[in-house]
Regions:
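Charged, low-complexity intrinsically disordered regions
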Residues: 1-88, 156, 266
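ASCE P-loop NTPase motor core, strongest for the SF2 helicase catalytic module
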Residues: 75-300, 305-307, 313-571
Length: 571
């Protein structure tokens, strides 16, 4: 009837689940009107992280959500005071430009300049976030440039960078090359923090932090930077708790793969960088992981529409606090990357050994899947045995006779690569298979360098390969899947598939990254009619889940569960 409804009393009445409210003229207004359904849904979302004792409040992490309330209200006193901040935070593409100081001795690309502005913008508002650019797009340089730009505002508190041990050298090298004015100190052992003098940036490893967490927790830090942040994706681990306990003005996570297996890993990162953005992990599982990954929906609700709604709500909340650019979007001048799957047929003797093991392990596993949580270790041990048998029987039985068809395929492929004057990175998850690869390459007269977790002089072997001493670099997936710049190679060979595609993508991006001037060829060696075929299909489902949440796909998938494992064991 044209009467104006004040927003704040309406907001409070809906939040308190009232069916009607009294207007200024004494008349009652029904709150069951369909026009209020959208507002009621938004309040249900906001109540998860708001307090109502002193009136409606919304954390500054929910400003994108607050903009939805603004859309529904004609007037809101609270919205007036929050409008300027909400306008900027709800669309991070409009962040004010930060001028990269002359002390940064690098020419940043436009997307990198925007990354610097985004980091500085969130820091000014004391909001953390996730820089989720594709691997190889220069996340380290963007952070260093942002630290240089905000150096005068640090207030004497150094930034703390936590990274895998293998990546610490990269921070040292890039800071010395690009921001030499920044005073960078490396803490490489327990007790080392006490010896740090005046520094702008302190760099340490996750291992040192875990062993010396009390000393780090006692300090007050400016920026906290988590490089390769997937290291803290499990909230049940000691390292996650140690990182969460650190006192910092603002926290940023760097990872091209902010989750690899499940959305709960994304929640674990955001609980550090943006605490309060989402409800508890339990509710996050119920409200997002269940519908999006596993298709769990309430009764009498159309499943597809409900999953899409939950996915869009997740995207909307995450979008202001995550910046992700892919190579296809911002590095059009990067040489192309081609991929080819090479199917390897097992020899008759190898096939006989594999099939016998498959029948035995299949019967064992299928009987355990009804209680996967309790039997997970046994199940994955059996799956790992089948994966190793797909490579070579000798990985399980050193006395086994017969050669490995995959090793034969590797040698043949490398001979062709070397004849063309190219150089190759060869990855395997199993160091024992790298041992067999060494023997095969030695017999073929192919020179190689090797890097795995036991390598003492990591920088030395990397430098030797970069210097051109050998045409082949054998690398374990865990030791060399991140933190290396190996653009000297333009061929990548993946000897065995891993459960999730993110780990393999990180390995490929050792060669296909900024600085590469030649097309990169990726070969995936898959043993035909083995568990490797099934693992490859599982990878594709996980890639769809990643794309559905972080990229603009409308696809849905599930994490690894009992049904996935049954699929791995199908004939």
């Amino acid at each position: 009837d044209g009467r104006r409804i004040p927003f704040t009393p309406l907001f409070t009445a809906l939040a308190l689940r009232r069916s009607k409210m009294m207007l200024a003229d004494g008349a009652y207004f029904s709150l069951r009107h369909p026009a209020l359904d959208r507002l009621r849904d938004l309040i249900d979302e906001a109540v998860e992280m708001s307090e109502w004792e002193t009136g409606p409040k919304i954390s500054r992490y929910q400003l994108a959500l607050w903009s939805d309330f603004e859309d529904l209200a004609d007037e809101s006193e609270a919205a007036v005071s929050w409008r300027a901040a909400a306008h900027t935070l709800q669309d991070v593409e409009r962040v004010p430009e930060t001028i990269v100081p002359d002390s940064v001795r690098a020419t940043l690309r436009p997307y990198q300049k925007h990354g610097v502005s985004w980091l500085c913008f969130l820091a000014v508002h004391r909001l953390g976030g996730i820089l989720a650019d594709d691997m190889g797009l220069g996340k380290t340089l963007q952070v260093l440039a942002a630290l240089a730009a905000r150096r005068e505002d640090a207030g004497g508190r150094p930034a703390l960078v936590i990274a895998p041990t293998s990546v610490i050298g990269t921070w040292q090298e890039e800071s010395a090359a690009f921001v030499p004015d920044l005073r960078v100190a490396v803490v490489s052992s327990t007790g080392g923090l006490a010896a740090v003098g005046e520094a702008d940036v302190v760099v340490t490893s996750y291992a040192v932090l875990r062993l010396d967490e009390t000393a780090f927790a006692e300090r007050e830090w400016g920026w906290l930077i988590l490089d390769e942040a997937q290291f803290v994706k499990n909230p049940a681990t000691r390292i996650h708790r140690a990182v969460a306990a650190l006192r910092a003005e603002v926290r940023f996570a760097l990872s091209g793969t902010p989750f690899e297996n499940s959305l709960i890993e994304l929640h674990a990162l955001l609980s550090i960088t943006s605490p309060g953005l989402f409800p508890s992990a339990r509710r996050f599982r119920d409200e997002y992981v269940g519908p999006i990954e596993k298709g769990k929906v309430p009764d009498n609700v159309e499943g597809g529409a409900y999953r899409r709604a939950r996915l869009e709500k997740l995207r909307r909340r995450v979008r202001p606090l995550m910046l992700r650019r892919t190579k296809a979007q911002v590095a059009a001048d990067l040489p192309p990357r081609q991929e080819q799957v090479l199917h390897v047929e097992l020899s008759d003797a190898h096939r006989a050994v594999y099939d016998i093991a498959l029948q035995r392990e299949r019967q064992k596993i299928l009987g355990l899947l009804d209680d996967l949580d309790r039997n997970r270790f046994i199940v994955f041990r059996s799956l790992t045995l089948l994966r190793m048998l797909s490579l070579a029987p000798r990985l399980i039985d050193p006395e086994a006779s017969g050669d490995s068809s995959k090793l034969d395929a590797l040698v043949a492929q490398l001979e062709e690569v070397i004849a063309e004057g190219r150089r190759a990175l060869v990855f395997s998850q199993f160091t024992s298979f790298l041992d067999l690869s060494e023997l095969a390459l030695g017999r073929a007269g192919i020179g190689f360098t090797r890097l795995d977790g036991s390598t003492a002089d990591r920088s030395g072997v990397v430098s030797a390969f970069r210097a051109g001493e050998t045409p082949v670099f054998l690398i374990s997936l865990k030791a060399g899947g991140f933190g290396l710049n190996l653009t000297d190679a333009d061929v990548v060979i993946l000897l065995d598939p891993w459960w999730n595609p993110a780990a393999e993508a990180q390995a490929v991006d050792r060669a296909h990254r900024l600085g590469q001037t030649r097309p990169v060829m990726v070969y995936r060696l898959i043993a035909s009619d083995t568990i490797e075929d099934k693992v490859r299909a599982l990878q594709q489902r996980k890639a769809r889940l990643f794309g559905a949440v972080l990229d603009d796909d409308d696809l849905f998938a599930r994490s690894l569960d009992a049904s996935d494992i049954r699929g791995l064991l199908e004939a």
